[in-house]
Amino acid sequence: MSTLNVPKETMSRKDPEKFFTIVEKLGEGSYGSVYKAINISTGIVVAIKKVSVDNDLEDMEKEISFMKQCKSPYIVTYYASFRKENEVWIVMEHCGAGSVCDAMKITDKTLSEDQIAVVSRDVLQGLAYLHSVRKIHRDIKAGNILMNHKGESKLADFGVSGQLSDTMAKRQTVIGTPFWMAPEVIQEIGYDYKADIWSYGITCIEMAESKPPLFNVHPMRVIFMIPNPSRPPPKLTEPEKWSPEFNDFLAKCLTRKPELRPSAEELLKHPFITKAKSHSLLVPLIDEQDIIINEKGREVALGIEQRDEEEEDEDEDSEDSDDNRGTMVRAKPRSMQNSGGEDNDEEYDTGTMVITDNKNSYDTVVFNNDDEDSGTMKLKNTMPSNKKNFVPDYMNQFKKSDDDVTNVPLSDKYSSYSLEELKKMLAELEIEREKEVQKTLEKFSINRQALLAVIDEKKSK
């Protein structure tokens, strides 16, 4: 490929619009929106992530530094970065087929076992490279696996990635997406690259079933349930429908003790991977996705355009509202199906918690050690709403309302609504859920800090 015409310096102050023309919005990542763009002088297509400087600039610099150091065909390539007014533009390789998550969402399909094996071979190659240079991705999921039109996969979105230095053999901060997080990450007992292996095991289930295990469980309960040693490791909902090789591969990825969990290099030798077929197996899925995108446009196919309009309406409404959710970033909810997740929720010491939006309707959670940040929790995710006074039924149940409507069978209650009305009601329900999450987290953080203060005081006596 030709060389891009871009400044060599990091965080260049030159105007990026003199180098690139934005074509369309591709999606929304954990740290900002991503756009397809063309390098004006060469015609090369790239992806540009625009990140508001309201976010932590230090984190962005870490991400850029991380990407610049990575040189692998299985890792998205970094090209340049710009600082423009209140935004940072990160220019990177464009993977035309988008993420695995987007492909599933747009086509409303899951991946076959053979397709999962092909993706897994590429992902494990990428992880093997990262781990060999002492780096941890820390946010492996289908939304962070990008594909090109050949069906080749690459790891992306290093917003929460970390590097293992010689003086810090194991990370002590907890950063990742709760449904995909390894037990040792949540327990804050220190972790290494094996955490990525667990996350990829969860990602394989996500690719097979469209959602990760426990997706229907409250996020706060999830972080209590995953580390519970009495809970069996996650597995496919119907393992008998999948090959013994795939089930065994998952079991190895999802080994609870990290010291017994195989490395990426070891997993590349597993029969499930060694028997993986050609990248061309992914092409039919990509072609089907492209047909839908050509008919509707990518933003409509992903629901981005509708969400942006709803956000504008919400912003207008919020000007006159006392309920200031200025720190929250709205995301479109995905439809939820009950998978019968267990309800055991023993509590664990989870530290101070930060939830940031990853735009896949699943929150990215950051726990900090007490010595790093004992401040209040931040919640940067909620859903769009057009009805401020809407109260979902589960809230009425909490209030023990005597309203007869709570006794109406749910299927009868909602059957008369149109599809669009049901979608809006689901979005509003998600808003109430996020409000309850925030209240719970605030209470949890306050109580924990109070307990720690008393413990420290007693220790000093």
Swiss-Prot record:
Its cofactor is Mn(2+). One of its GO terms (cellular component) is cytosol. One of its GO terms (molecular function) is protein serine kinase activity. The keyword Plastid does not apply. CDD domains: STKc_MST1_2. It catalyses: L-seryl-[protein] + ATP = O-phospho-L-seryl-[protein] + ADP + H(+); L-threonyl-[protein] + ATP = O-phospho-L-threonyl-[protein] + ADP + H(+). One of its GO terms (biological process) is regulation of adenylate cyclase-activating G protein-coupled receptor signaling pathway. The modification Phosphothreonine is found at residue 173. Belongs to the protein kinase superfamily. STE Ser/Thr protein kinase family. STE20 subfamily. This is Serine/threonine-protein kinase 4 homolog A.
